[in-house]
């Protein structure tokens, strides 16, 4: 896996990320095309679940570790697929094994209390699969 620092501005139109995988599986390919081509602006600054996720990432990692005894390491980089550099991933962290080596992807999501667990899993399954492919976990 190639790693590119998030400190550099990543042009999201230059690759396919995990959220994009969700759009593709949901059949929203036209919406994704318009975003990638710059025909519509993707402004997530007022999307509450996105903002909650950004502002609570550290807490979510700590909470997961407290509940599972599995440490989570923050990932501060945009990951690139080792063969296809247009396949990208911005993961919330790595779940570590007893040797403190990555054994899985940590991805926290904010949903409302009325959303059923099966619905959440179905919605985000493509994104997590995408992240596991890119991170090789």
Q: What are the roles of these predicted feature ranges?
A:
Residues 59-61, 67-137:
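Mg2+/Mn2+-dependent nuclease catalytic core
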